[in-house]
A protein has these predicted regions:
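Membrane-proximal helix-turn-helix segments that form the acceptor-binding/catalytic region
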Residues: 29-32, 55, 79-96
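Short His-centered aromatic/hydrophobic patch
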Residues: 41-46
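A conserved mid-protein helix/loop that constitutes part of the nucleotide-sugar donor-binding site
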Residues: 143, 147, 152-166, 187
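Nucleotide-activated donor-binding/catalytic signature segment of Leloir-type glycosyltransferases, i.e.
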Residues: 186-205
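Short alpha-helical donor nucleotide-sugar binding micro-motif in glycosyltransferases
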Residues: 204-205, 212-217
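Aromatic "clamp/platform" in nucleotide-sugar-dependent glycosyltransferases that forms part
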Residues: 225
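Short hydrophobic beta-strand element within catalytic cores of glycosyltransferases
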Residues: 242-245
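Conserved acidic donor-binding segment of nucleotide-sugar-dependent glycosyltransferases
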Residues: 260-268, 276-282
C-alpha cells in the first residue's frame, strides 16, 4: 500500500443512477462506525450522507468538484438529491474544498460559506509514439483534433462536431470517451457526425491508448458549458498540447494566456478558431512549446497533497 493507504470495498447497486448514491451510503455507514479520524467526501451527491459520520464525531471534509445539480444529464429527482448533498456539506462539513474560483464564489454568495481553494494537480507524463492509435484508428502525430471526456451535454461536444464539420481541413476529429448514464446523447452525437468520415469515436480509452491520444494530438479541445476543475485539460497541457477551450472561468482561469479561447456555446466562433489553428501551424506550435512547463508548475500534485493533509490535521 502507498504510505499505508488501503482500499476498502463497500456494498453498492450497479444500476443506472444508483451506483454512486448506494456507494456513498455504504461508505458513510462504514466511516461512521469505523476507527477513522477524518472522513473525506467527494462530489455533492455523496455529501448527502456527510451528516452521519459527523454525528459520530468524525472530522468531515467535503470536496466539491463542480456544481453537479446543474448538469443536464440529471433529472429532477437526482438534481434534488444532489442539491441536498450540497446543503448538507454547507451545514455539516468541517471544511469544504473547491477546485475553482467560480465555485468558491458560488458558495460565498449563496450560503455565506467560506471554502478552501485546492485545485487538482498534474504530473509530467512520458510521451509515447503513435503506435496503438495508428493500428486501431489510423491516426498519426498532429493529424487530429482531440476531445477526451465523458459524452455528456454540458461538455459542448455537439458544438465541436457542428463547428468542425464546417472547417476546411484534412485533419480528423477524435471524440474519445464513454457515456455517463447518457447513452441516448452519445447516439445523438454519432448521428450528427455520420456524414463526415473525418470524425472518429473511440469509446472509453485508458492506459497506452489514452497516453498516445494525448501525446500526438494537433489540438486538444474542451468546449464545455459547465465544468468543475477540468482534470483532462490539465492532463492535455501536461502532454504539451495546444488547447482550444470555452471562455468559462473554470477553463479560462486554468489556461490564462497559454491556450486558444472561444466564446462559450458560440459555434461560429469555435469554427473560426478551429480554422485559424488548422491554418496557422506556427501559432499552434507556440502554444505547444509553452503548455507543459506552465501547467506542471502551476498545478503541482505535491502541493495539492500538502495542503489537503493540512486540512486533515487542523
Amino acid at each position: 500500500a502507498y504510505k499505508g493507504v488501503r482500499l476498502k470495498s463497500v456494498l453498492t447497486l450497479d444500476k443506472k443512477g444508483l451506483a454512486a448514491m448506494t456507494a456513498s451510503v455504504s461508505g458513510a455507514i462504514c466511516a461512521a462506525f469505523g476507527k477513522y479520524d477524518v472522513v473525506h467526501f467527494h462530489a455533492e451527491g455523496p455529501c448527502a450522507m456527510l451528516w452521519l459520520p459527523k454525528l459520530f464525531g468524525k472530522r468531515c471534509i467535503a470536496t466539491v468538484h463542480g456544481l453537479d445539480h446543474q448538469r443536464a444529464k440529471w433529472g429532477k429527482l437526482a438534481s434534488t438529491y444532489i442539491m441536498m448533498g450540497e446543503k448538507c456539506a454547507v451545514k455539516c462539513a468541517d471544511e469544504i474544498i473547491v477546485l475553482s474560483k467560480g465555485v468558491q464564489d458560488y458558495f460565498k454568495e449563496t450560503y455565506g460559506r467560506e471554502t478552501k481553494f485546492i485545485p487538482n494537480g498534474v504530473n509530467r507524463p512520458v510521451i509515447r509514439k503513435p503506435e496503438l492509435i495508428k493500428e486501431k484508428f489510423g491516426l498519426e502525430k498532429d493529424d487530429y483534433i482531440l476531445f477526451l471526456g465523458r459524452l455528456v451535454p454540458e461538455k459542448g461536444i455537439a458544438y465541436l462536431i457542428e463547428a468542425f464539420k464546417k472547417v476546411n481541413t484534412d485533419k480528423k476529429l477524435v471524440i474519445a470517451g464513454g457515456s455517463s448514464d447518457t447513452d441516448e446523447f452519445a447516439s445523438q452525437l454519432k448521428e450528427m457526425a455520420k456524414d463526415d468520415d473525418r470524425i472518429i469515436f473511440t469509446g472509453f480509452v485508458q492506459g497506452q491508448l489514452l497516453d498516445e491520444l494525448y501525446g500526438n494530438a494537433y489540438i486538444y479541445s474542451l468546449p464545455s458549458d459547465l465544468e468543475g476543475m477540468p482534470l483532462s485539460l490539465l492532463e492535455a497541457m501536461s502532454y504539451g498540447n495546444c488547447c482550444l477551450v470555452s471562455d468559462i472561468d473554470e477553463c479560462a482561469s486554468v489556461v490564462e494566456d497559454k491556450a486558444i479561447v472561444f466564446k462559450k456555446s458560440d459555434v461560429a466562433d469555435l469554427q473560426s478558431k478551429l480554422q485559424e489553428a488548422c491554418d496557422d501551424v506556427e501559432q499552434v506550435q507556440k502554444y505547444k512549446d509553452e503548455a507543459a512547463d506552465y501547467i506542471c508548475e502551476k498545478y503541482n500534485w505535491d502541493d495539492v497533497v500538502k495542503r489537503t493533509l493540512e486540512l486533515y490535521r487542523a
